[in-house]
Amino acid sequence: MGLNKSASTFQLTGFPGMEKAHHWIFIPLLAAYISILLGNGTLLFLIRNDHNLHEPMYYFLAMLAATDLGVTLTTMPTVLGVLWLDHREIGHGACFSQAYFIHTLSVMESGVLLAMAYDCFITIRSPLRYTSILTNTQVMKIGVRVLTRAGLSIMPIVVRLHWFPYCRSHVLSHAFCLHQDVIKLACADITFNRLYPVVVLFAMVLLDFLIIFFSYILILKTVMGIGSGGERAKALNTCVSHICCILVFYVTVVCLTFIHRFGKHVPHVVHITMSYIHFLFPPFMNPFIYSIKTKQIQSGILRLFSLPHSRA
């Protein structure tokens, strides 16, 4: 198979049939974009500069915030360009790079949530050994493994995109590049590119979810063995924020997968809207979840803006 010699650009798509409303759709998406940047940026700033937050739990939270920022910064510039400027053209190289980062960061987010579940598991099940198990070095190693696993797992299918000829329509179905959209336009044998992502989905994302699920069964079993009701509530509260983030991420994954697999007769705009929800809702919600449910983050925000706060 030779290097791709077909036309060098793809055409991105906003909301088909709603082109006259693109400027209005741009406004809430821009607001969400700014909120995500501010929310996750604030979390990263707090964790970096507040010594009270220099603990494994918050280092993992910083990884989640950085991943969410990465997803947003990768997808939203082309979305806003399409909606406001009608800038639909994107080169093959830029498109494939965008697809690589979008899919890598999605797998990485699943890995970070698994790492956070491990942190919660150690906190509840082995509190006396917590500091000896989750040292700064160990946290760094976990972060590198999560990043490496995600980056290497996505690379094979994206590398192959550079070699496919594209002789069909060059119009993509979203305002950003996704692997599954691009391969539909290829005039070549795409069997590997169809099957490999399914393997990644089951071997990584689904496996991550199952490990998280069973770890929380063990956590719940430990918590239920605590005699005091107050201590049980305190122990559960330790992991409430993480549980909320897990639900936000995996529910959107399940909904998006369901729509793509079984929604053949669903209007295309529903597919597009669900994609935006999948990529924007978790990064938008995660900072709010941790700000509302975690007292240390609340205190850090109040200190950042020099507001008096109760120590109760």
Swiss-Prot record:
Q: The organism sits in which domain of life?
A: Eukaryota
What's the protein name?
A: Olfactory receptor 51B6
- UniProt-annotated location(s): Cell membrane
**UniProt keyword Cell inner membrane, yes or no:** no
Q: What is the lineage of its organism?
A: Eukaryota, Metazoa, Chordata, Craniata, Vertebrata
Q: How does it sit in the membrane?
A: Multi-pass membrane protein
In the UniProt record, does the keyword Disulfide bond occur? Answer: yes
Provide the membrane-side ranges marked Cytoplasmic in the record: 45-52, 119-137, 216-235, 293-312
